[in-house]
From Swiss-Prot:
The lineage of its organism: Bacteria, Bacillati, Actinomycetota, Actinomycetes, Pseudonocardiales. The keyword Magnesium applies. Its EC number is 4.2.1.90. This is L-rhamnonate dehydratase. It comes from Saccharopolyspora erythraea (strain ATCC 11635 / DSM 40517 / JCM 4748 / NBRC 13426 / NCIMB 8594 / NRRL 2338). The record marks 288 as: Increases basicity of active site His. The gene is rhmD. Mg(2+) binds at residues 211, 237, 265. GO terms for molecular function: L-rhamnonate dehydratase activity; magnesium ion binding. Keywords: Lyase, Magnesium, Metal-binding.
Length: 390
């Protein structure tokens, strides 16, 4: 069966661009970032424009009218790339030509792509192709990937309230780091004091982690890690900018051996992860399947990690990563992003954009046998097609 049409759509508000939230959402409340060196951009990530792109939805329609859906953070610029460039490699191809289509999209965009926005767009197309193939074959995507190796997924929560996450049955709670190097010793002490208070609340047998969102340097991250070890910090995540592979290697040497070093949410393709694994030596890599190149590339990234003895715990991405994680032995648990504004309730990550999105109960998540990724676009969400290529 052939593919008839590709459509790139945009939406404003909650969706794949989960930073595009209303004010007072915990996910945007004083988070350390590379921009925190500038005081005017310290209190909010939206202040420097983290939500300017918005959500991109890609629909791939087969000759029989079956539609596959993929999403990412790319908005209108990503829609232009899909409609004006990538669509030519998809339309007219067989629904089973997933690997060939990926290779053509990647190689055709090398001169302006390789990472970032272009890979986000490629990822959305790739995910839509997997969703389409699963629907046509009447199989969930995890069946296309070799089948599950476990009955359910164990989840940790990324949250502003690890204490609530513990009550809800999650493995652990990952907090955003609030203060970076520009805030000096006082900020470092504030980070540790927050960890101390949270450890006091949750007790000894619950994971606590810090997400540093690329905000630190090797020296600060080393000091933070050793100070946090007293309160049994499980891991330090994305301490450095993605391109500092040498710095990650040095940080791994300096960190306490009992603490995990994790990173990779803003890395792309097997080539970037090869550098990261060989030079940075992380314990866990965290590719985002909506950004890193889609399922097609995540398969290769995961194999690389397995050969390097690293775990793969994808960043966010809900069903699009769940269907992968459940098929891999080196992905022993998964992330669940608490998207309730106060992080006090379990709500679907991509709400209101997607319907039928499964959520964990008691910190555990079971995937249904629904074909494809098992989700539908919400007809009440207003989608716009800013470009076409007809």
């Amino acid at each position: 069966m052939k593919i008839r049409q590709v459509r790139a759509l945009t939406v404003t508000g909650g969706g794949a661009d989960y930073h595009d939230q209303a004010e007072d959402h915990w996910i945007d409340d004083h988070v350390a970032t590379p921009m925190a060196k500038y005081p005017e951009y310290r209190a909010s990530r939206q202040a420097f424009g983290i939500n300017v792109l918005g959500t991109l939805v890609v629909e791939v329609e087969a000759e029989d009218g079956t539609v596959g859906v993929g999403v990412t953070t790319a908005g209108e610029p990503g829609a232009y790339i899909v409609e004006k460039h990538l669509a030519r490699f998809v339309e007219g191809a067989s629904v089973t030509d997933v690997e060939k289509i990926w290779d053509q999209m990647f190689n055709a965009t090398l001169y302006y792509g390789r990472k970032g926005l272009v890979l986000n767009a490629i990822s959305a197309v790739d995910l839509a192709l997997y969703d389409l193939l699963g629907k046509i074959r009447q199989e969930p995507v995890y069946a296309l990937l070799g089948g599950p190796v476990r009955d359910e997924l164990q989840c940790y929560a990324t949250t502003g309230r690890p204490d609530v996450a513990k009550e809800l049955g999650f493995l652990g709670g990952k907090m955003t780091l609030q203060h970076g190097p520009a805030e000096g010793v006082e900020g470092l002490h504030a980070n540790i004091e927050r960890l101390r208070k949270m450890r006091e609340q949750v007790g000894p047998d619950f994971w606590l982690m810090f997400d540093c969102w690329m905000a630190l340097d090797v020296e600060y991250a080393t000091r933070l890690a050793h100070a946090a070890a007293e309160y049994d910090l499980k891991w330090l995540e994305e301490a450095l900018i993605p391109d500092d592979y040498w710095g990650y290697g040095e940080l791994r040497r300096r960190m306490p051996s009992t603490m995990l070093m994790t990173t990779g949410e803003h890395e792309h393709t097997r080539y970037g992860f090869r550098l990261l694994l060989e030079m940075g030596r992380p314990d866990i890599i965290q590719p985002d399947v909506n950004w890193c190149g889609g399922i097609t590339e995540l398969i290769k990234i995961s194999a690389l990690a397995d050969a390097h003895g690293a775990m793969v715990v994808p960043h966010g991405s809900s069903v699009y990563s769940y269907h992968f994680v459940i098929t891999r032995h080196n992905s022993p648990f998964t992330e669940f992003l608490m998207m309730h504004p106060q992080a006090t309730e379990v709500v679907p990550m991509f709400s209101p954009l997607l319907l039928d999105e499964p959520v964990p109960v008691g910190g555990r998540l079971r995937l249904p046998e629904t074909p494809g990724f098992g989700v539908r676009l919400n007809p009440e969400v207003e989608l716009r097609r800013p470009y076409d290529h007809d």
